[in-house]
Swiss-Prot record:
List of residues binding Mg(2+) 2: D174, D177, D300
Entry-linked Pfam families: Inositol_P
Sites bearing N-acetylmethionine, chain numbering: M1
GO biological process: chondrocyte development; embryonic digit morphogenesis; endochondral ossification; phosphatidylinositol phosphate biosynthetic process; post-embryonic development
Pathway note: Sulfur metabolism
Glycosylation sites: N259
Gene: BPNT2
Name of the protein this chain belongs to: Golgi-resident adenosine 3',5'-bisphosphate 3'-phosphatase
Protein backbone atom coordinates (compact mmCIF):
# COMPACT_ATOMS: atom_id res chain seq x y z
CA UNK A 1 0.00 0.00 0.00
CA UNK A 2 1.42 3.37 -1.01
CA UNK A 3 1.52 6.21 1.56
CA UNK A 4 -1.64 8.31 1.98
CA UNK A 5 -3.68 5.48 0.47
CA UNK A 6 -2.35 6.15 -3.09
CA UNK A 7 -1.87 3.04 -5.16
CA UNK A 8 0.75 3.19 -7.98
CA UNK A 9 0.18 1.04 -11.02
CA UNK A 10 3.16 -0.69 -12.72
CA UNK A 11 2.78 1.74 -15.66
CA UNK A 12 2.95 4.72 -13.33
CA UNK A 13 6.09 3.40 -11.67
CA UNK A 14 7.72 2.90 -15.09
CA UNK A 15 6.85 6.44 -16.24
CA UNK A 16 8.16 7.91 -12.99
CA UNK A 17 11.46 6.01 -13.33
CA UNK A 18 11.92 7.10 -16.96
CA UNK A 19 11.35 10.75 -16.03
CA UNK A 20 13.92 10.46 -13.27
CA UNK A 21 16.48 8.89 -15.58
CA UNK A 22 15.88 11.64 -18.15
CA UNK A 23 16.57 14.37 -15.59
CA UNK A 24 19.75 12.63 -14.41
CA UNK A 25 20.98 12.16 -18.00
CA UNK A 26 20.41 15.82 -18.84
CA UNK A 27 22.30 17.03 -15.78
CA UNK A 28 25.18 14.60 -16.23
CA UNK A 29 25.63 15.24 -19.95
CA UNK A 30 25.71 18.99 -19.32
CA UNK A 31 28.37 18.46 -16.66
CA UNK A 32 30.52 16.37 -19.02
CA UNK A 33 30.19 18.91 -21.83
CA UNK A 34 31.37 21.62 -19.47
CA UNK A 35 34.36 19.56 -18.40
CA UNK A 36 35.33 18.74 -22.01
CA UNK A 37 35.07 22.41 -22.93
CA UNK A 38 37.20 23.40 -19.96
CA UNK A 39 40.01 21.04 -20.94
CA UNK A 40 39.91 21.96 -24.64
CA UNK A 41 38.46 18.65 -25.86
CA UNK A 42 35.62 20.24 -27.74
CA UNK A 43 37.20 20.29 -31.18
CA UNK A 44 39.81 23.02 -31.62
CA UNK A 45 40.07 24.01 -35.28
CA UNK A 46 42.41 22.25 -37.65
CA UNK A 47 41.57 24.39 -40.67
CA UNK A 48 44.09 26.73 -42.21
CA UNK A 49 42.11 29.91 -42.57
CA UNK A 50 39.54 29.99 -39.82
CA UNK A 51 38.78 28.86 -36.34
CA UNK A 52 35.27 27.78 -35.37
CA UNK A 53 32.43 30.26 -35.76
CA UNK A 54 31.35 32.12 -32.66
CA UNK A 55 28.63 30.46 -30.64
CA UNK A 56 25.24 32.13 -30.82
CA UNK A 57 25.08 32.31 -27.02
CA UNK A 58 28.67 33.54 -26.56
CA UNK A 59 27.63 36.59 -24.52
CA UNK A 60 29.65 39.77 -24.92
CA UNK A 61 33.30 40.73 -25.23
CA UNK A 62 35.02 43.97 -24.28
CA UNK A 63 36.76 45.62 -27.23
CA UNK A 64 39.17 47.37 -24.90
CA UNK A 65 40.28 44.00 -23.56
CA UNK A 66 40.46 42.66 -27.11
CA UNK A 67 42.75 45.54 -28.05
CA UNK A 68 45.06 44.77 -25.12
CA UNK A 69 45.25 41.08 -26.05
CA UNK A 70 45.69 41.90 -29.74
CA UNK A 71 48.69 44.11 -28.97
CA UNK A 72 50.17 41.38 -26.79
CA UNK A 73 49.52 38.75 -29.47
CA UNK A 74 51.20 40.83 -32.18
CA UNK A 75 54.25 41.37 -29.96
CA UNK A 76 54.46 37.69 -28.93
CA UNK A 77 54.18 36.63 -32.55
CA UNK A 78 56.81 39.18 -33.48
CA UNK A 79 59.18 37.70 -30.92
CA UNK A 80 58.92 34.36 -32.74
CA UNK A 81 59.39 36.00 -36.13
CA UNK A 82 62.53 37.78 -34.94
CA UNK A 83 63.95 34.71 -33.16
CA UNK A 84 63.60 32.50 -36.24
CA UNK A 85 65.08 35.12 -38.58
CA UNK A 86 68.06 35.68 -36.29
CA UNK A 87 68.65 31.93 -36.05
CA UNK A 88 68.88 31.90 -39.86
CA UNK A 89 67.04 28.56 -39.92
CA UNK A 90 63.79 29.44 -41.69
CA UNK A 91 62.67 26.01 -42.97
CA UNK A 92 61.33 27.84 -46.00
CA UNK A 93 58.81 26.10 -48.25
CA UNK A 94 56.14 26.98 -50.79
CA UNK A 95 52.41 26.64 -50.10
CA UNK A 96 51.76 26.91 -53.84
CA UNK A 97 51.58 29.74 -56.32
CA UNK A 98 50.00 33.16 -56.03
CA UNK A 99 47.65 34.33 -58.78
CA UNK A 100 50.60 36.17 -60.29
CA UNK A 101 52.59 32.93 -60.45
CA UNK A 102 55.05 33.66 -57.62
CA UNK A 103 55.79 31.19 -54.83
CA UNK A 104 53.49 31.63 -51.83
CA UNK A 105 56.16 31.12 -49.21
CA UNK A 106 55.92 29.93 -45.61
CA UNK A 107 58.62 29.68 -42.95
CA UNK A 108 58.98 28.55 -39.36
CA UNK A 109 58.52 32.21 -38.46
CA UNK A 110 55.01 32.16 -39.94
CA UNK A 111 54.07 28.92 -38.19
CA UNK A 112 55.43 29.71 -34.72
CA UNK A 113 54.10 33.27 -34.74
CA UNK A 114 50.70 31.99 -35.82
CA UNK A 115 50.62 29.48 -32.96
CA UNK A 116 51.39 32.10 -30.31
CA UNK A 117 48.97 34.68 -31.71
CA UNK A 118 46.07 32.32 -32.37
CA UNK A 119 46.10 30.51 -29.05
CA UNK A 120 46.60 33.66 -26.97
CA UNK A 121 43.51 35.20 -28.57
CA UNK A 122 41.55 31.94 -28.54
CA UNK A 123 42.27 31.28 -24.86
CA UNK A 124 41.25 34.83 -23.90
CA UNK A 125 38.17 34.94 -26.16
CA UNK A 126 37.02 31.37 -26.86
CA UNK A 127 33.62 32.39 -28.24
CA UNK A 128 34.79 34.64 -31.11
CA UNK A 129 35.64 33.58 -34.64
CA UNK A 130 39.33 33.84 -35.55
CA UNK A 131 40.56 33.82 -39.15
CA UNK A 132 44.29 33.38 -39.66
CA UNK A 133 46.58 33.01 -42.64
CA UNK A 134 48.32 29.83 -41.55
CA UNK A 135 47.06 26.33 -40.73
CA UNK A 136 46.10 25.80 -37.09
CA UNK A 137 47.26 22.32 -36.07
CA UNK A 138 45.35 20.89 -33.10
CA UNK A 139 48.41 18.80 -32.21
CA UNK A 140 50.30 22.03 -31.47
CA UNK A 141 47.59 23.49 -29.26
CA UNK A 142 48.81 25.74 -26.46
CA UNK A 143 47.00 27.30 -23.53
CA UNK A 144 48.48 30.80 -23.37
CA UNK A 145 46.94 32.82 -20.57
CA UNK A 146 46.40 36.57 -20.47
CA UNK A 147 46.92 38.25 -17.10
CA UNK A 148 43.94 40.61 -17.66
CA UNK A 149 46.14 43.68 -17.33
CA UNK A 150 45.35 46.47 -19.77
CA UNK A 151 48.42 48.64 -20.58
CA UNK A 152 48.36 52.22 -19.36
CA UNK A 153 48.60 53.70 -22.85
CA UNK A 154 45.38 51.90 -23.81
CA UNK A 155 43.59 52.89 -20.56
CA UNK A 156 44.57 56.51 -21.21
CA UNK A 157 43.00 56.53 -24.67
CA UNK A 158 40.10 54.11 -24.20
CA UNK A 159 38.74 55.16 -20.82
CA UNK A 160 35.78 52.79 -20.56
CA UNK A 161 34.94 49.21 -21.56
CA UNK A 162 33.19 48.74 -24.92
CA UNK A 163 31.00 45.63 -24.88
CA UNK A 164 29.78 44.01 -28.11
CA UNK A 165 28.09 40.65 -28.78
CA UNK A 166 30.72 37.93 -29.21
CA UNK A 167 28.85 36.52 -32.19
CA UNK A 168 29.31 39.83 -34.05
CA UNK A 169 33.12 39.69 -33.81
CA UNK A 170 35.59 38.34 -36.35
CA UNK A 171 39.33 38.44 -35.66
CA UNK A 172 41.82 38.49 -38.54
CA UNK A 173 45.44 37.48 -37.84
CA UNK A 174 48.45 37.89 -40.10
CA UNK A 175 51.28 36.19 -38.20
CA UNK A 176 53.96 37.35 -40.63
CA UNK A 177 53.26 39.92 -43.30
CA UNK A 178 55.87 40.19 -46.08
CA UNK A 179 57.10 36.59 -45.97
CA UNK A 180 58.90 37.00 -49.31
CA UNK A 181 60.88 39.93 -47.93
CA UNK A 182 61.46 38.00 -44.69
CA UNK A 183 63.19 35.24 -46.64
CA UNK A 184 65.32 37.87 -48.40
CA UNK A 185 66.25 39.37 -45.00
CA UNK A 186 64.55 42.68 -45.88
CA UNK A 187 63.50 43.11 -42.28
CA UNK A 188 61.99 46.59 -42.34
CA UNK A 189 58.97 45.39 -44.34
CA UNK A 190 57.99 42.62 -41.91
CA UNK A 191 55.01 43.05 -39.56
CA UNK A 192 52.62 41.01 -37.46
CA UNK A 193 49.00 42.15 -37.43
CA UNK A 194 45.71 41.65 -35.63
CA UNK A 195 42.35 43.15 -36.57
CA UNK A 196 38.95 42.93 -34.92
CA UNK A 197 35.86 43.47 -37.07
CA UNK A 198 32.34 43.88 -35.68
CA UNK A 199 29.55 42.95 -38.08
CA UNK A 200 32.13 43.02 -40.86
CA UNK A 201 33.41 46.53 -40.10
CA UNK A 202 37.03 46.96 -38.94
CA UNK A 203 37.03 48.56 -35.49
CA UNK A 204 40.48 47.92 -34.05
CA UNK A 205 43.84 47.20 -35.60
CA UNK A 206 47.37 46.44 -34.46
CA UNK A 207 50.49 46.53 -36.66
CA UNK A 208 53.75 45.47 -34.99
CA UNK A 209 57.25 45.71 -36.51
CA UNK A 210 59.28 42.93 -34.87
CA UNK A 211 62.73 44.18 -35.84
CA UNK A 212 62.30 47.78 -34.66
CA UNK A 213 59.80 46.78 -31.94
CA UNK A 214 57.41 49.54 -32.96
CA UNK A 215 53.69 48.89 -32.49
CA UNK A 216 50.83 50.97 -33.88
CA UNK A 217 47.27 50.44 -32.63
CA UNK A 218 43.96 52.20 -32.98
CA UNK A 219 40.28 51.71 -32.16
CA UNK A 220 37.47 53.34 -34.13
CA UNK A 221 35.64 55.79 -31.82
CA UNK A 222 38.15 54.85 -29.13
CA UNK A 223 41.72 56.08 -29.40
CA UNK A 224 45.14 55.35 -30.84
CA UNK A 225 48.86 55.58 -30.21
CA UNK A 226 49.57 56.73 -33.77
CA UNK A 227 48.47 59.75 -35.79
CA UNK A 228 48.31 61.11 -39.30
CA UNK A 229 51.09 63.32 -40.63
CA UNK A 230 50.54 67.06 -40.72
CA UNK A 231 50.36 67.28 -44.52
CA UNK A 232 49.99 65.18 -47.67
CA UNK A 233 50.68 65.93 -51.33
CA UNK A 234 47.51 65.27 -53.31
CA UNK A 235 48.67 66.85 -56.58
CA UNK A 236 51.91 64.92 -57.10
CA UNK A 237 51.70 62.20 -54.47
CA UNK A 238 54.26 59.66 -53.39
CA UNK A 239 52.54 56.33 -53.99
CA UNK A 240 53.54 53.17 -52.16
CA UNK A 241 52.88 49.96 -54.11
CA UNK A 242 53.85 46.30 -54.05
CA UNK A 243 57.35 45.50 -55.27
CA UNK A 244 55.90 42.98 -57.71
CA UNK A 245 53.88 45.45 -59.78
CA UNK A 246 55.45 48.87 -59.24
CA UNK A 247 56.07 49.37 -62.95
CA UNK A 248 52.43 48.75 -63.79
CA UNK A 249 51.20 51.40 -61.34
CA UNK A 250 53.97 53.87 -62.20
CA UNK A 251 52.87 54.14 -65.82
CA UNK A 252 49.31 55.06 -64.87
CA UNK A 253 50.36 57.29 -61.96
CA UNK A 254 52.56 59.42 -64.18
CA UNK A 255 49.69 59.84 -66.64
CA UNK A 256 47.26 60.72 -63.84
CA UNK A 257 49.36 62.92 -61.53
CA UNK A 258 52.25 64.05 -63.74
CA UNK A 259 55.98 63.43 -64.00
CA UNK A 260 56.72 64.57 -60.44
CA UNK A 261 54.89 61.59 -58.98
CA UNK A 262 57.10 59.21 -57.00
CA UNK A 263 56.51 55.46 -56.85
CA UNK A 264 57.79 53.66 -53.74
CA UNK A 265 58.01 49.87 -54.21
CA UNK A 266 57.62 48.12 -50.86
CA UNK A 267 56.79 44.77 -49.31
CA UNK A 268 53.96 44.01 -46.93
CA UNK A 269 50.54 45.65 -46.62
CA UNK A 270 51.18 46.57 -42.99
CA UNK A 271 54.34 48.47 -43.92
CA UNK A 272 52.50 50.30 -46.70
CA UNK A 273 49.74 51.52 -44.36
CA UNK A 274 52.33 52.74 -41.85
CA UNK A 275 53.93 54.69 -44.71
CA UNK A 276 50.85 56.93 -44.69
CA UNK A 277 51.18 57.78 -40.99
CA UNK A 278 53.45 59.68 -38.61
CA UNK A 279 55.61 56.76 -37.51
CA UNK A 280 58.75 57.36 -35.39
CA UNK A 281 60.73 54.61 -37.11
CA UNK A 282 63.73 55.68 -39.16
CA UNK A 283 63.43 52.63 -41.43
CA UNK A 284 59.85 53.54 -42.40
CA UNK A 285 59.39 55.29 -45.75
CA UNK A 286 56.74 57.98 -46.19
CA UNK A 287 53.98 58.01 -48.81
CA UNK A 288 50.80 59.92 -49.58
CA UNK A 289 48.78 57.10 -51.17
CA UNK A 290 48.75 53.32 -51.08
CA UNK A 291 47.55 51.56 -54.23
CA UNK A 292 47.24 47.82 -54.82
CA UNK A 293 45.91 46.44 -58.10
CA UNK A 294 45.67 42.66 -57.61
CA UNK A 295 43.80 40.17 -55.42
CA UNK A 296 44.67 40.48 -51.72
CA UNK A 297 43.72 38.62 -48.54
CA UNK A 298 41.73 40.29 -45.77
CA UNK A 299 44.20 39.40 -43.01
CA UNK A 300 46.75 41.48 -44.96
CA UNK A 301 44.65 44.64 -44.87
CA UNK A 302 42.10 44.54 -42.04
CA UNK A 303 44.40 45.95 -39.34
CA UNK A 304 45.54 48.79 -41.58
CA UNK A 305 41.96 49.51 -42.59
CA UNK A 306 40.91 49.77 -38.94
CA UNK A 307 43.80 52.09 -38.06
CA UNK A 308 43.14 54.38 -41.03
CA UNK A 309 39.42 54.46 -40.26
CA UNK A 310 40.08 55.34 -36.61
CA UNK A 311 42.26 58.26 -37.75
CA UNK A 312 39.73 59.54 -40.28
CA UNK A 313 41.32 57.92 -43.31
CA UNK A 314 39.94 55.53 -45.91
CA UNK A 315 40.69 52.15 -47.41
CA UNK A 316 38.40 51.00 -50.22
CA UNK A 317 38.50 48.98 -53.39
CA UNK A 318 39.77 50.90 -56.41
CA UNK A 319 36.16 51.59 -57.34
CA UNK A 320 35.50 53.17 -53.93
CA UNK A 321 33.59 50.34 -52.28
CA UNK A 322 33.94 49.66 -48.56
CA UNK A 323 35.46 46.26 -47.67
CA UNK A 324 33.46 43.81 -45.56
CA UNK A 325 35.48 41.58 -43.23
CA UNK A 326 33.08 38.66 -43.24
CA UNK A 327 32.60 35.82 -45.70
CA UNK A 328 35.45 35.10 -48.12
CA UNK A 329 39.04 35.71 -47.06
CA UNK A 330 40.05 37.87 -50.03
CA UNK A 331 38.98 40.77 -52.23
CA UNK A 332 39.24 41.13 -55.99
CA UNK A 333 38.85 44.87 -56.48
CA UNK A 334 42.30 46.16 -55.57
CA UNK A 335 42.92 48.83 -52.93
CA UNK A 336 43.16 52.56 -52.53
CA UNK A 337 44.18 53.90 -49.11
CA UNK A 338 44.45 57.56 -48.16
CA UNK A 339 44.20 59.90 -45.21
CA UNK A 340 43.42 63.63 -45.06
CA UNK A 341 42.61 63.61 -48.77
CA UNK A 342 39.42 63.68 -50.81
CA UNK A 343 39.25 59.91 -51.21
CA UNK A 344 36.28 59.77 -53.58
CA UNK A 345 37.87 62.41 -55.81
CA UNK A 346 40.95 60.18 -56.01
CA UNK A 347 38.75 57.21 -56.93
CA UNK A 348 37.19 59.21 -59.77
CA UNK A 349 40.56 60.49 -60.94
CA UNK A 350 42.26 57.12 -61.21
CA UNK A 351 41.63 55.00 -64.31
CA UNK A 352 40.37 51.43 -64.03
CA UNK A 353 43.54 50.15 -62.39
CA UNK A 354 41.93 46.97 -61.11
CA UNK A 355 41.68 45.58 -64.64
CA UNK A 356 45.43 45.95 -64.98
CA UNK A 357 45.92 43.43 -62.16
CA UNK A 358 44.41 40.55 -64.16
Amino acid sequence: MAPMGIRLSPLGVAVFCLLGLGVLYHLYSGFLAGRFSLFGLGGEPAGGAAGPPAAADGGTVDLREMLAVSVLAAVRGGDEVRRVRESNVLHEKSKGKTREGADDKMTSGDVLSNRKMFYLLKTAFPSVQINTEEHVDAADQEVILWDHKIPEDILKEVTAPKEVPAESVTVWIDPLDATQEYTEDLRKYVTTMVCVAVNGKPVLGVIHKPFSEYTAWAMVDGGSNVKARSSYNEKTPRIVVSRSHSGMVKQVALQTFGNQTTIIPAGGAGYKVLALLDVPDKSQEKADLYIHVTYIKKWDICAGNAILKALGGHMTTLSGEEISYTGSDGIEGGLLASIRMNHQALVRKLPDLEKMGH
